[in-house]
Every structure is written in structure tokens, then in C-alpha cells.
Amino acid sequence: MSNTEKNLPTKYDHMSVEEGLYQWWLEGKYFEATGDEKKQPYTIVIPPPNVTGKLHLGHAWDTTLQDILTRTKRMQGYDVLWLPGMDHAGIATQAKVEGKLREEGISRYDLGREKFLEKAWEWKEEYASHIRQQWGKVGLGLDYSRERFTLDEGLSDAVNKVFVQLYEKGLIYRGEYIINWDPATRTALSDIEVIHKEVQGAFYHMNYPLTDGSGHIRLATTRPETMLGDTAVAVHPEDDRYKHLIGKTVTLPIVGREIPIIADEYVEKDFGTGVVKITPAHDPNDFEVGNRHDLPRILVMNEDGTMNEKAGKYNGMDRFECRKALVKDLQEAGVLVEIEPHMHSVGHSERSGAVVEPYLSTQWFVKMAPLAEKAVALQQKEEEKVTFVPERFENTYLRWMENIHDWCISRQLWWGHRIPAWYHKETGEVYVGTEAPADIENWNQDNDVLDTWFSSALWPFSTLGWPNEDAADFKRYYSTDALVTGYDIIFFWVSRMIFQGLEFTGERPFKDVLIHGLVRDEQGRKMSKSLGNGIDPMEVIEKYGADAMRFFLSTGSAPGQDLRFSMEKVESTWNFINKIWNASRFVLMNMDDMKYEEIDLTGEKSVADKWILTRLNETIESVTRNMDKYEFGEAGRSLYNFIWDDFCDWYIEMAKLPLYGEDEAAKKTTRSILAYVLDQTMRLLHPFMPFVTEKIWQHLPHEGESITVAAWPTVREDLQDAEAAAEMHLLVDIIRSVRNIRAEVNTPMSKKVQMQIKAKDEAVLAQLTKNSSYIERFCNPSELTIQTDLQAPEKAMTAIVTGAELFLPLADLINLDEERARLEKELEKFDKEVERVQKKLSNQGFVAKAPAAVIEGERAKEQDYLEKREAVRQRLADLEK
């Protein structure tokens, strides 16, 4: 990057700083993996966002963490591949495209499958472009030369191969099962696509008559319309109330079908009446009970949520209309004995909002137990296991794997990977293969597509060229080093990538999984459309810049924890960047056209020089160690404290002494140290704030084209000086103590005062004498005395620091008579306040009627006034000493 400006602009403007830099990085190909065999590879594949719209704050957080990792590793000399890509997001994208078509007054059926898919691809191209623009705004160092999409030809080949191989191993089968069914979109849903909401419903209590006429058995349901498909009534085998009824039958009300009373341990004896209706075609638990007892499965609904011919006279009714009509009929028949209001959790489709129906359907499934077994066994092998950060999420993962159910992988959609299965038109024979049958005219392909998570589970290796195991990228960059993702998709995605990676590559797909939480608002609420508390990251970037947003997101919480988003804290980060900018301007204005090769750290150094270089070493060690542990918050805090406190507030101020002095050698050393420390600090900060660090670094004396490929700082033992650091700590303590004393008595720093320091021994005396110029510069004494045998003066403000005692005579600081009068007036004011609040708190009427928070507030005031009064009394006493 050519740079003709000697100095940075006067004001930090994030928009002008970030403008154009990303494109310059892309043109320089700094983010492209080189394949350099001399370097160790480091690989991350991006969790692919859905091509359904804009990225949200969760995406910004997730990708910022990945960018921090990959930028750091690139600077540390790794051959970094951060592979970008997007997910076709089957149902989500299809719902969006269908919604757009509805606005035009047409449906997907009007278009037909091929034309509809053309529309879906048009949508994908438009929104993929938006997502790339947003990635650029955040500053993500992605290798676009390797960008992938889950419906790419190569990835589709991988999907088909995996399906066929699992089918041939008997691990994919077609069968009936209860799935989450969305009647509005007419497709199966994964658990993650079901949103549970608290809904006001009811328990419908009914009497089912015993067929022999000897009485009835009472039970309750929240879905009375499903009783039309009941095939049994169940009780617990050890429930003494019903043991005598096991094996008998009841007559299903309205329907008149005779069904058995069975015993099953699924029933909870102590819940309700201890009797449950069993509807195997409309409830997952009932389905399992039905399998154990060989019960028939009677499906009483159509795919659109209307009742079918098995529902008798309710055939054709919407399921909820059927509920109303059936309840009325049950009441009239005297079967319904009570309707008990009941709030309960009901699943709704994330896409359509429709109430999800547990529904018996013929679907394709993956047999999970054998696959999960291998994944669980892997975690026993210390060198080969997947490491979860934080570690507690490994238990979450293992618990799910050990209690896993078969996975429904078919979806009744058009957008997605079409299932590679064909049915013979005459014989019904099923053919599964990566290629269509040779006599294709005699076969019909399965209309369904695969669950989006099926292709996503192959993402770490399909994106690198598998199933071609000789592909250069697959051989070099697999398995990947880290996956960064939220805890909400450990089950749906992380676990599936692990077992598919093991099954098809024989290796874990990634070494580490860094888990983060969810982005919440300042009140801790989940961001959602209904609450209206969502925040667009692009708006944050426009207002405060990507660097400020990134630093807040990456340092605002610990691994595995949720993040409370605060615009105020992003603004504070912007202020921090502004301070860095101003400090950098000061450094650059004092460089005197210094070239990179002129930076010389071998000259004689002051205690401040040695200290800042030692603190830089400590910061390099801390940042590097915490980055290796994924503790980005700790790394960021180390940098913040070093830059704000050590470099800006102390060293730059101390550097002004030699810079504005006459000693040319000292000036040169100071310039070199300023340039070196700022250069190293910008490198450490670069993964967090890529834009502003590149801008500043380009103005500094440097070698190389871009900070993105500059070497990561390392600790230099030759610049470590513990003694100088201790000396500096003493100086800082003295200066701070003097400033505190002046603030306490309202004496400005501009007023000169006597200052006496009693050193505890000759060594401290020598240190303070040698560094007295700093004390004179920052404490502004009219006279400075440093001795080991100093007698404490009368009427002086004092402070004790490690190794020394300070005295500032009061007569120099204040007019004693005026200060005494002022303090007495203060004391009188606090006496009145204490009396007022204590009188209020002793009033029994007030205490009895006032809210607890108000009383607590008054007690806090009392404590505050008492402490302030005591401080004033102490100050008055000090004046009399």
C-alpha cells in the first residue's frame, strides 16, 4: 500500500479508515492459502450461513472469533486456509422463494419443479452477493478462491456417495416413523426448526367404557381429535388400581372400535389418573409403545392438517375444527366429563408458524447407534479426540450421543439434494445409486430431498475435495484445526460432522470445537423479531466501525457464555480506538522521517524505556498464551490495559522529556522505542481490529506489504528488565499518590508544592535520585527532598508506597484557615443529612408502608453520609496535627 501522508489525519474517522482496505487485501491475495510445504497448515471451514437474507449479530460474533484465530495463525507463519461458503438451507430458502412467488400470485406448483429451482438459484445468487458484502464489512480474511456452496456439483457428488454407502451398509433405511410435520409447508421438520411456545389449551377428561359393561376408565388428553386413531389404552403394570383390567378392552367413544387395555412402564402411575390413550400414528411415545405391543397404526389426518376418511364423519375437516366438533359430540354423548384449562408448550414451525403435528410418515432414516458408538469411543482416545472448549460441553455432546434416536433425513421439498433413490414403475423395486438407472424411462426418482443438515454434516471434508481422497486440498488441509460455533447446534451439526467425518475419512473432522453462546440484549433477553430488540451489525459498523464492533464482540464474554450486546460498550471501544489513533499521531509526528532500518534498541535506555519494553514482553506473552487457549477476552484486556495505561498514559508522557530535550542520542532511542512498541502493539491488536491497525502500521516505519502477513511478536529476553520494571512501579505509585492527595484537597497540578520523600534504604534513595526528573515533571514540586533519615513534617498530607513515604506540607497545598472553614461547613451539612435520614428510618409508619427498595435506598444514603462525615472529621483532625 503506497502511503504519501507523513501523518495520520487529525481525527479518527472509522468510515474513511475502513474504506477500500478490504478490497486492497483481496487484490493482494493475503487471505489465500499458499500450499507452501515449508509452513504448517492451519484450517478452519466457516459454518455456512443460510442464503436466506442478512447476517445477524450472532454471525458477526462467530465469524469475528474465526477471523481472530486465522489472522493470528497467518502472522505466526502458518499456511492458513479459512474456507468460506454458504448453505442452501432447504426449507428456509424454499419458504422465502415461495413467499416471493405468492406476492406475484403464483405457487411453486404453477411453475413446476425445474422452473421453481431456477427461481431458487436466482435467489441464492442475489443473497450470496449480499452475504459476501457483509463479510467484507466485518473484515473477514476469507479465501474466496475456495468458496463453496452446499449444492455445488462437487458437494452434491459427496452427498450422493455418502447416501449410497450408508444405504449399502444398512445404515440408511426407509420406514414409518413419527416425525415433526408442518401441515402448512407439507414437509418434515428437524427439531431445530420447531419453536416451542406456551399456549392456553385444555385437558379433556373422558370416560372410555369397558366393553363388558362393567364400568369405565378415565383418562385425559390435550389433543382430543387424535382419539379417532387410538388403538389401545395403557396403564402401569404395577398400578394396583388397574391390574385387574389389564387384558380387557374398552370401546372407543364415537368410533365404536374395541381396543385393548395394555400394561407398559412408559405410563406414570402418579400423573393424572395413571391411564393414557395410545395413538401410535400421532405421538412419538405412543409409537414406541405401539411397537412394543404390536399395535396397529391408524393415521387420521392428511398431510395438509385436515382429517381423512379414517376419521369417519369428520373427514375433510381442519384438525382444529374437528376438535371443536368432536368435543361437542363427546359432551352430548356424556363421555367428556371435564375441560380443565391448561397452559402447555406447543411446537410451531419456525418457517410457517403452523402448529407442528407429530405425524406417522414413510421417510428415509439414518440408523444412528452404530455411527454414534464410534464417535463416543473416539472421545476415550486422548490424542485423537475432539477437544471441546469449554470442556463441559463434551459431556453435553456425549449425553446426546449415548441416547440418540434414528435421524429422519427426508424432506418434502424441491430445493435441496434430491434423494438418489428410484422406484421401478411396474415392480416397485428400489434402486439406490450415485448414477440414475440405465433404463431411466422405467423408473421414477424419489421426489423428496435430503435434510439440509445431511449435507452440512459433510462440510469439513466435502469442501476440500472429498470423495477424491487424492485432492490436493483434502490431503493438505484435512482434518481441520478448529470449529467455532454456538452451543445451540452441538446436536444438530457438530455431532453429525464428527460421526460422518469418522465414518468416511477415518479421522475427526476438527481438532478443537470452540463453543460460544447466544447474543442477547442488555436485559439478557434473546434477540427476536417479536421483541423488536434485534440489532443489525451493519448499522453498528456504520455508526462505530467494524473494529469497535469486533473488539467488543470478541472480548465481551468468556467461552461458552452468552453475550449481552451493549451499544454503549461499543461506543467505549470506539473511544479506545480514538485514543490509540491520537497516541499513534503523536508517535508519527515525532518520527523525524525515521526509516525501518534506523530503528535501534541498543542505545542507552531510561528506566521508562526499559519498563515499557518489559511490559511489552509481558503483554506479548499474555496475549499469545490466551489466544492459544481461546481466551480472547483475557487477551483483549491485556492489550487494552497495556495500550491505555502503560503506553498512552505513562510512557508517551515520559517520552516527552527526551523528545523535547537536547540529548540527540536519547531522542533517537526514544523514537526507536516508540516506533518499535507501536509496531508490535499494532501486530498484537491486528486480529481484533484489522482496519485501524493496518492503517496505522502503513504509516509507521515498516518492512513488508501488509500487517496481515507481518510476523507475530515474540518475547525478546534481551529487552526484559525486572529491576527497571520495579523502579518504574515505585515511580508510578509516587506520582499517583501525589495526584490523589492534590485531588483530595482540590489543589490543581499547576500549583507548585513542597514535596518530601523518605526512602526506606540507600537502594531506593539511589533509584529515586536517578529518576527525580520524572517526579519533577509529573508532580510539579516547588522543592523536592529525597532522604533516608527524613523527619515527618507537622501538618502534612502523607502517603505510603512500597519503599518510601511521601509528605506534602498542608500550608503549600491549601490556605489552612479557609480549608478549616470549608470543612466545618461540610461537616455541618453532613450532620443535617445524617439526622434527616435517621429520623426517616426511625419513623415506624414510613418503614411499614414504604417499598423495600425505597427503604434500602435510604439506608444506603445513611451509610454514604456517615462515611463522608467521618472523612471530613478526619481531614479536620489532620489540620490540627
Swiss-Prot record:
CDD domains per UniProt: Anticodon_Ia_Val, ValRS_core
Record flagged with keyword ATP-binding: yes
Motif ('KMSKS' region) on chain: 526-530
Pfam families (alphabetical): Anticodon_1, tRNA-synt_1, Val_tRNA-synt_C
Intracellular or extracellular location(s): Cytoplasm
Residues engaged in binding ATP: K529
Keywords: Aminoacyl-tRNA synthetase, ATP-binding, Coiled coil, Cytoplasm, Ligase, Nucleotide-binding, Protein biosynthesis
Intervals of motif 'HIGH' region: 49-59
A GO molecular-function descriptor: aminoacyl-tRNA deacylase activity
Keyword Protein biosynthesis annotated: yes
Coiled-coil region(s): 810-881
Annotated InterPro entries: aa-tRNA-synth_I_CS, aa-tRNA-synth_Ia, Anticodon_Ia_Val, M/V/L/I-tRNA-synth_anticd-bd, Rossmann-like_a/b/a_fold, tRNA-bd_arm, tRNAsynth_Ia_anticodon-bd, Val-tRNA_synth_C_sf
One record GO biological process: valyl-tRNA aminoacylation
GO CC term, one of those recorded: cytosol
Catalysed transformations (reactions): tRNA(Val) + L-valine + ATP = L-valyl-tRNA(Val) + AMP + diphosphate
SUPFAM superfamilies noted in UniProt: Anticodon-binding domain of a subclass of class I aminoacyl-tRNA synthetases, Nucleotidylyl transferase, tRNA-binding arm, ValRS/IleRS/LeuRS editing domain
Superkingdom in the source lineage: Bacteria
Function: Catalyzes the attachment of valine to tRNA(Val). As ValRS can inadvertently accommodate and process structurally similar amino acids such as threonine, to avoid such errors, it has a 'posttransfer' editing activity that hydrolyzes mischarged Thr-tRNA(Val) in a tRNA-dependent manner.
Domain writeup: ValRS has two distinct active sites: one for aminoacylation and one for editing. The misactivated threonine is translocated from the active site to the editing site.
Subunit structure: Monomer.
NCBIfam families to which the protein is assigned, alphabetical: PRK05729.1, valS
Family the entry assigns: Belongs to the class-I aminoacyl-tRNA synthetase family. ValS type 1 subfamily.
Name of the molecule in the record: Valine--tRNA ligase
Organism of derivation: Bacillus cereus (strain ATCC 10987 / NRS 248)
